[in-house]
Regions:
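Charged, compositionally biased, marginally structured helical/coil segments
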Residues: 1-56
C-alpha cells in the first residue's frame, strides 16, 4: 500500500511530466498503473491538493 507521500510524489509526476490537468484522468491512470496499491480517498486528496497548488 502506498503512503500519502508516495501518492503525492506520483501524482506530481503525472501533473508535471505527463501534463495531466484533471482529477478524473489522473485517478484513472493511477488505477490502471497501480491496481490495489492505494485507497481511493487518500489518492483523491493528493490529486486535489496538487492540482490546487498547480493552479495557485
Amino acid at each position: 500500500m502506498m503512503t500519502q507521500n508516495e501518492l503525492e510524489n506520483l501524482v506530481g509526476c503525472y501533473i508535471h511530466l505527463e501534463g495531466y490537468t484533471d482529477l478524473r484522468s489522473i485517478y484513472n491512470v493511477l488505477r490502471q498503473e497501480y491496481p490495489g496499491e492505494f485507497d481511493r480517498k487518500p489518492a483523491l486528496e493528493a490529486i486535489r491538493k496538487l492540482l490546487k497548488e498547480e493552479r495557485d
